[in-house]
Design a protein with these regions (language model features):
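Short, intrinsically disordered terminal segments enriched in charged and Pro/Gly residues
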Residues: 39-113
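Short recognition patches in nucleic-acid-associated and regulatory proteins
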Residues: 1-21, 32-61
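Short Cys/His-rich metal-coordination motifs, predominantly Zn2+-binding knuckles/fingers
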Residues: 24-27
Length: 113
């Protein structure tokens, strides 16, 4: 199933990481979406996660101010920091949705490579 939201703006996109600003089609709540692919070098089974975190007004303003346009890879840690603040909705590699607690989402791992 798909979630009722629209991507309003790309903040960073690559083949293994992506961040987008989104908006709920029903209520207009802004969300920060984060995609991360963990590469399975040994078995080729890449694990892909997508996570969404609702944004409050000051966070949306801060992101809009700090990211007036899409930026490069150096922006990943700056955008990742938002996901440690509150629970996030996660779509895991098993195509299952669940809410995670702050700090335990696999997407919070540091950038490597």
């Amino acid at each position: 199933s798909t979630l009722p939201y629209e991507i309003t703006r790309s903040l960073y996109e690559s083949s293994h990481y992506a961040f987008w600003l989104c908006e709920c089609r029903y209520c207009g709540t802004p969300w920060l979406e984060y995609f991360k692919e963990f590469i399975g070098w040994l078995d080729g089974d890449d694990k892909m996660y997508t996570s969404w975190m609702p944004l409050v007004e000051f966070e949306l303003a801060e992101i809009s101010r700090n990211f007036p346009q899409e930026r490069g890879r150096e922006s990943i840690p700056e955008l990742q920091k938002y996901f440690g603040r509150r629970r996030t909705l996660v779509l895991d590699p098993k195509n299952s949705y669940h809410w995670d607690q702050p700090g335990i989402n696999p997407l919070h791992l540091a950038v490597t490579g």
